[in-house]
């Protein structure tokens, strides 16, 4: 029983350490893409994400499973383009 509780607690803690979002480039903007997921998947995995894809409607890479220390784009704190 104790082992089961330990496993469940471990899974919950692992989930807390990951986030999803649009990674930012050096200028604070989303990483742009047009078509295909290979570029975004590579960019996201370089940031230690589990995967990434090109969200075509936003023309930007979206990463899943990013570490907490990676900054992601947020419309509320958008500094892209000197805003």
From Swiss-Prot:
PROSITE patterns: LCN_CSAB. Residues 19-81 form the LCN-type CS-alpha/beta domain. GO terms for cellular component: extracellular region. It holds the Pfam family Toxin_3. It is found in: Secreted. Expressed by the venom gland. Beta toxins bind voltage-independently at site-4 of sodium channels (Nav) and shift the voltage of activation toward more negative potentials thereby affecting sodium channel activation and promoting spontaneous and repetitive firing. CDD domains: neurotoxins_LC_scorpion. It comes from the Eukaryota. InterPro entries: LCN-type_CS_alpha_beta_dom, Scorpion_toxin-like, Scorpion_toxin-like_sf, Scorpion_toxinL, Scorpion_toxinL/defensin. One of its GO terms (biological process) is defense response. GO terms for molecular function: sodium channel inhibitor activity; toxin activity. Gene3D superfamilies: Knottin, scorpion toxin-like. This is Beta-toxin Ct25. Keywords: Amidation, Disulfide bond, Ion channel impairing toxin, Neurotoxin, Secreted, Signal, Toxin, Voltage-gated sodium channel impairing toxin. Disulfide bonds join 29-80, 33-54, 40-61, 44-63. Its main location: secreted. Residues 1-18 form the signal peptide. Has the structural arrangement of an alpha-helix connected to antiparallel beta-sheets by disulfide bonds (CS-alpha/beta). Belongs to the long (4 C-C) scorpion toxin superfamily. Sodium channel inhibitor family. Beta subfamily. The modification Glycine amide is found at residue 81.
